[in-house]
Amino acid sequence: MAVIFRSISGCITSAESVLITQQSHEELYRVLRHNKQVSSTEQKVVVVSVSPQSRASLAAHYGIGSSEVARKLTSFLKHLGVHHVFDTAFSRSFSLIESQREFLQRFSQREADKKALPMLASACPGWICYAEKTHGEFILPYISTTRSPQQIMGSLVKGYFASQKGVSPQMIYHVTVMPCYDKKLEASRPDFYLSEHETREVDCVITSGEVLKMLEEEKVSLRDVQPAPLDTMFSNVCGEELLGHAGSGSGGYLHHIYKHAAKQLFGVDVDELTYKTMKNKDFQEVTLEKDGQVLLKFAAVYGFRNIQNLVQKLKRGKSPYHFVEVMACPSGCLNGGGQLKPSADQSNKELLQQVEEVYRSEHPSVPEDDSQVAELYQSWLESVGEEKARQLLHTQYHAVEKTANGLSIKW
């Protein structure tokens, strides 16, 4: 248990353990089997949304490119009976745009609201779980309300996609493939349950490792699978290649918010970000200075020891940052607990390096320049910052009282 839930603070409740065990590749198989036994009108539309980090993990394992993994995985999943395979880099574009917008808003309110800054990233569910359980009301106002790419994809699939297809959200079975077990907990949050339709926005989360298990159970090597065309509806596609985002392997939040804020607030065009390593490689700073004055100070803080230091600084009123990209796992999402493990003749460090190389090989796209994203802001959300966008692309957090079983996690 401690290996699986390595990023969560304190204890795992019994209820959370149950929620997680309900989500596995066996559940996906169960739905696919059920679809084959019922009439077409009773079948669920099965959608699988794959994270770029999971693609990179599988690509490093098989020694093939990330976009090739996407095409082959699309083929494999559709052969099993999946109807659509999407890419969460697409929903991440919304997450990055909303995070940029939210940061500018918080920056403008920093004098009136002492907890507007630093804005703390919200895409990591291990970090959110820790914040809610351990620091509650103190820390939550600092955390960005922008949903993670997984949960924005949940909104897209059970909202826009369902309406476009003329299907009730409860007749869609939405699976995500993630680098992290804690994403199963995130999908189970009551905030992401559509009570009107009695369905979750994300029904099941499986890890990169569980996808490998599926391939092994089917006695298939991804190398040997005939590729299929990529679904273009919710994917960042250029020709036959998937596009990624610049910045870290955890989504590039610091990179995109920093460049956007520098331009919008101070008229500064930043080409390259210069990272300064602090106590260790999992704690880095980026500073924008002009005429000797610090205009922006951002940090990337990964792993719980660094996170604990950050929280203590906040509590003492000593944090110098405007924004912090916070991730529970050392080295971030590419090193998530649900990623593939190294082979016998490979170290963790070597594997991580390969995964990072694959991830960075994807051509980066700029979220604001994505015409499909811009079109959806108009047709689905009725433009950036409007009430519908706040409802479907943002969330809230809840301080949790400390009642749990004894599954204590050590970092």
UniProtKB/Swiss-Prot annotation:
Which keywords has UniProt assigned to this entry?
4Fe-4S, Iron, Iron-sulfur, Metal-binding
Biological processes per GO annotation: iron-sulfur cluster assembly; regulation of angiogenesis; sprouting angiogenesis
Metal-binding is among the record's keywords: yes
**What is this protein called in UniProt?**
Cytosolic Fe-S cluster assembly factor narfl
Per UniProt, [4Fe-4S] cluster 2 binds at: C124, C180, C329, C333
Q: What would be one Pfam family of this protein? A: Fe_hyd_SSU
Cellular component aspect of the GO annotation: cytosolic [4Fe-4S] assembly targeting complex
The organism is Danio rerio (Zebrafish)
| InterPro entries per UniProt | Cytosolic_Fe-S_CAF (IPR050340), Fe_hydrogenase (IPR009016), Fe_hydrogenase_lsu_C (IPR004108), Fe_hydrogenase_ssu (IPR003149)
Functional summary from the UniProt entry? Component of the cytosolic iron-sulfur protein assembly (CIA) complex, a multiprotein complex that mediates the incorporation of iron-sulfur cluster into extramitochondrial Fe/S proteins.
Q: Which gene encodes it?
A: narfl
Q: How does it assemble?
A: Component of the CIA complex.
